[in-house]
């Protein structure tokens, strides 16, 4: 039986931050061009893993699918916390 009282360490394959940033910028721009609420669509994708939240236009869907959702979330949280310090 596992002990759920211990904190597990999370690790993932390191992807350059600029790659994550450029993909998110392209996805955001594409969603806005299509008239969607970009933040809601990205959150929907991150929570569900369903690529249908992201359009195929500008290769946005293909690009975001090549980055693990965990990596995207780590980058978003990291940047949010950096910004909130200022």
Curated annotation (Swiss-Prot):
Pfam family, one: IreB
InterPro entries to which the protein is assigned, alphabetical: IreB
NCBIfam families xrefs: PRK05473.1
Family statement: Belongs to the UPF0297 family.
Stated name of the protein: UPF0297 protein SERP1181
